Regions:
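Short boundary/loop segments of OB/S1/cold-shock single-stranded nucleic-acid-binding domains
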Residues: 1-19
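Alpha-helix capping and helix-loop boundary segments enriched in small/acidic/polar residues
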Residues: 7, 59-63
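Right-handed beta-helix
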Residues: 17, 65-72, 78-220
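Acidic-leg catalytic submotif of subtilisin-like serine proteases
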Residues: 20, 36-38
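Short aromatic-glycine-enriched beta-strand elements
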Residues: 27-35
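A short macromolecule-binding patch
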Residues: 41-51
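Short, structured beta-strand/loop micro-motifs enriched in basic residues and often containing a Trp
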Residues: 50-60
Length: 220
């Protein structure tokens, strides 16, 4: 691509820091407005431009959309060195902003954390890998390798867990409601520790009970 004709103005090659000033592109092009503090901020020297945001996946009505926060620091480069054509290559922590997780030598943690403290975390610890999705309220989904299980937990303590033994445990604080036109249970034995109550019971074979009064056709 031929460089823009701009009267032979200065060219800026390499990468430069910039500060985000606006993320709502009125032209609908998905650009982000940035300011270049290193060019000065006095009067006419407050230089700003709408920058194209680079993404690992961008296509028509699809892609990865994660916009930087206003006032956050980003790293930009300029097409053919033209100050009017900036591209945001990524964001940067700069000392005033801190990482969402303190680094460790083992480098096992990968994390995506939002402003409201919602987190998607990958733990690559050898022998006990884990993926977790959590919210500040306490809701969480955890996939673990050690023990190999999956847990879905509500902030109020209700839990759905798929265990290493192959069982599924559901713990509800109040009730467990199932609504469907038909519910089919296929099992050699179904065990209930308390009272089983129903409006109509139809059996195809026998009812074994210390106290039972059958109706016509073995309908209760």
């Amino acid at each position: 691509m031929a460089p823009p004709v701009d009267g032979g103005g200065a060219r800026y090659f390499g990468v430069y820091p910039a500060l985000v000033t606006d993320i709502v592109d009125q032209d609908g092009l998905g650009r982000v407005q940035v300011r270049f503090p290193w060019l000065g901020t006095d009067g006419d020297r407050d230089v700003r431009a709408w920058a194209t945001l680079c993404s690992p996946y961008a296509d028509d009505q699809q892609g990865l959309e994660i916009l930087p926060e206003v006032d956050s620091q980003v790293v930009v480069a300029f097409e053919a060195g033209d100050l009017r054509r900036p591209y945001i290559l990524g964001a940067a922590w700069n000392g005033t902003t801190t990482l969402p997780h303190s680094p460790e030598a083992a480098n096992n943690i990968r994390i995506l954390r939002s402003r409201s403290d919602s987190r998607l975390e990958f733990d690559d610890t050898a022998g006990s890998a884990k993926v977790s999705l959590t919210m500040a309220s306490g809701h969480q989904i955890i996939l673990e390798d050690a023990p190999p299980q999956i847990t879905i937990q509500h902030a109020n303590g209700c839990v759905l867990r798929m265990t290493p033994a192959g069982s599924i445990e559901i713990n509800a604080n109040v009730s467990l409601d199932v609504t469907a036109p038909t519910v089919n249970v296929t099992a050699p034995v179904s065990t209930f520790s308390g009272i089983v109550q129903c409006s109509t019971l139809i059996t195809d074979a026998f009812v074994v009970s210390p106290a039972y009064t059958p109706g016509v056709g073995n309908i209760w």
